[in-house]
Amino acid sequence: MVDDSHNAPFDKTKFDEVLEALVGLKDNEGNPFDDIFEELPSKRYFPDYYQIIQKPICYKMMRNKAKTGKYLSMGDFYDDIRLMVSNAQTYNMPGSLVYECSVLIANTANSLESKDGTLNEEENEEMESSINEEHKPGTNEIDVPKVIQNILDALHEEKDEQGRFLIDIFIDLPSKRLYPDYYEIIKSPMTIKMLEKRFKKGEYTTLESFVKDLNQMFINAKTYNAPGSFVYEDAEKLSQLSSSLISSFSEQPKEHSPATSKHEPEETPASPTPSVSASTSRERSTSVAPSFITSDQAATPDVLKSEEAHVESFSKESEKDQTPIPEDVPSPMDTLSQANYGAFALIKSFPSTPVPDFLNFSHKSVMGRSTFNMPNFPEPKFFEDIPNTERCILSAFICSPPQLPLPNPLRMYLPCPSLNSTEVSVITLAPQHSFLNIVINLNPALALKSYTIITLLNGKRLGAGVSTPPSTLYALEGIKHTEEPIRTVYEAKLSVGLNCLEFVLGSTEPVEPPSIEPGLPASAYSRTVERERFVLMAYVQP
């Protein structure tokens, strides 16, 4: 049953009370943030906002609509609140101040609108009502297990134009460590894996019970992800496909095999027929990389796949990177274990070669050394020594340059994947955050050792490596190193689309000379060996 407050006639007094409650909200530090949503962003400073956001809305516009009588029901007002939240989460990166404040607004508005905080129950009811009408006792009886199996097989085989399986995003739940807010927003998590487990246990005795869980999975995806995002669109397409298949199967008598007929859902041009064997579907689903990958999940490395067509040419399986890798350094792109909220919607998995061939891509990204005042970040972890099991590259700070007049500058802390140099960090950036200061924090124990840091952007080395000055080594000889991390600062201008930043730390090892030649420096009898590589994939939204 839909909450009556949504369809209730518009009440100006109730409107004022709800808006006052939303305006009075404060962030985690106790600071009000109503000014962020009071008016629309400046067209002068944020022209791209009005290219990305098609229906801008703010508190001021809501007051004007209430004053001029444009709200016919309280539901119209709450719909504008949800639109404002969706706009904020579409334009701003997850983890930013605006994004986090929008989540708080959404939760508060939902609880005010309905006592039990139910969201989007209309979609469940529409699906269930259509099923109840089409599957009443005495009408066309169907083989429920066979229909469910065909629906699952069809969902597993649905692809987009680039050949990407849409169901991959819905196989597993997000990591609680990487996405803690997911479980605060989504109260009834559901995945394809959970559906299949219940199906195998025989818990779905009716088609209605299966469709209810299936529809819950799509509602969760459309609640947590903003409209227009990859996940939201995939959920919409799969929801249309499942609805079409259910309608088609319900029209067939039990003795008729649904696997022999073709079903072409509307508005899904590349949809497969449901005549897919269960064994074929299960074999494919076990080989794909799940959209949320944690350190305890193994995924077969695949080619790099991105949402943008201009990157597609670099993700062919036939491409082989010839960059040599020392035997003691694993390939840096074997697995994807760290990801930002939106990253899984843009990138599926990474190749096993160390660096994709981005050199032929016509990008305008630049990078160089930079000096600036360090923001107040939390101190990174450090180590007293550097055994083989500890990291030398500790973490990275990413922030907007202080000279840019941004109302919501970016500030991000990225811990390096612990004890595993094969993991990759992935972030999604809003267009206004394409100018960055990147701070690499090194283990302070390196102050007593000879090391080299090399930076690469899209596979191309940028400038000379930053090495430890010999004078520093002599001055610190025999002195215990400080606990302050060694920081190297870079300034980067990233282009729209996918950017690959790599920070390679090498150490110098002595090499026995073939013969003693007077006059040669000691460096002539040494070599640089790659020890660690921190890889950051940054996707700048268009």
UniProtKB/Swiss-Prot annotation:
Any Pfam family: Bromodomain
One MF annotation (Gene Ontology) recorded for this entry: chromatin binding
GO cellular component: chromatin; cytosol; nucleus; RSC-type complex
Designated name of the protein: Chromatin structure-remodeling complex subunit rsc4
Basic and acidic residues bias locations: 252-266, 304-322
Record carries keyword ATP-binding: no
PANTHER family for the chain: PROTEIN POLYBROMO-1 (PTHR16062:SF19), SWI/SNF-RELATED (PTHR16062)
Region Disordered: start-end pairs: 114-139, 246-327
Keywords of the record: Bromodomain, Chromatin regulator, Nucleus, Phosphoprotein, Repeat, Transcription, Transcription regulation
CDD domains noted in UniProt: Bromodomain
Subunit and interaction comment: Component of the RSC complex composed of at least arp9, arp42, rsc1, rsc4, rsc7, rsc9, rsc58, sfh1, snf21, ssr1, ssr2, ssr3 and ssr4. The complex interacts with histone and histone variant components of centromeric chromatin.
